[in-house]
């Protein structure tokens, strides 16, 4: 005997009421999944269905979708050439590639518009999704049993705690605090942030200390502490070229820490586009958590 519509609704409401988690979606990042799957058709409906499916899988009482809208004003203030390498890459596109990109971003815009009818969805000009996600975790993460970050971006692992994990829809893997060494060659988030400050991030055009990769960086952090501890101890002993480079990089280390430390600088990153913007975003997120 098939279920009545009333029974189906009752079970759906009971399932929703049992959810205790928060899910934060890297919305632009998720959109590129459809582009990389060579989708040349509108994908708004599939986009929202994917988020709904993930929300059910991760028992999300609250789901928040975030999008990027231009480069981070905050990071550009500290590093004017931030992500400048991407501008060069885009300038070299063929006319066909430009047309496909324009079409994709139109479809992505449609996906976000449809998403707004189902989930709280935010894009702020000059603020990156990373910073909004970090602030949401800081502001309301403690109100939930667990927080799930949906992104392929490993930078989001700077937000991991015992109660915060990440799922990547490309690797189909979950990333937890206990797995930091396996995925990032460090023992914890503090070391991960310090390693990123030392190495930089060429993908974002952030220069690091020349001659120091993941292995050397990890060994330095293990011996001398986090990046602020290292700065306090400069110059470090040693005649190796990479040590000399490190000793000459105090300003670079400070700058890079500001650029990569999402938990510490997320508030500043949002406020960089206006205190009123931060205040409204704070109010909106707190209201969502109360629902």
Swiss-Prot record:
Q: Which SMART domains match?
A: 53EXOc (SM00475), HhH2 (SM00279)
Induction profile: Expressed in the early phase of the viral replicative cycle.
One Pfam family name is 5_3_exonuc
Q: How is the cofactor bound?
A: Binds divalent metal cations, probably Mg(2+). In vitro low metal concentrations selectively stimulate the endonuclease reaction. Endonuclease activity is suggested to require only the first cation, whereas exonuclease activity is suggested to require binding of both. High pH favors the exonuclease activity whereas low pH favors the endonuclease activity. Metal ions enhance substrate binding.
Quoted from the entry, the domain comment is: Three alpha-helices form a helical arch which forms a hole in the protein and through which the 5' flap of the scissile ssDNA is threaded.
* Record's keyword annotation contains Cell membrane: no
Outcome of mutating residue 266 to S: Complete loss of inhibition by PHMB
GO BP, sorted A to Z: DNA replication, Okazaki fragment processing; late viral transcription; viral DNA genome replication
- Summarize the activity regulation: Inhibited by p-hydroxymercuribenzoate (PHMB).
pH-activity note: Optimum pH is 9.3 for the exonuclease activity, 5.5 for endonuclease activity. High pH favors the exonuclease activity whereas low pH favors the endonuclease activity.
Changing residue 115 to S does what?
A: Complete loss of inhibition by PHMB
Q: Supply the name of the protein.
A: Flap endonuclease
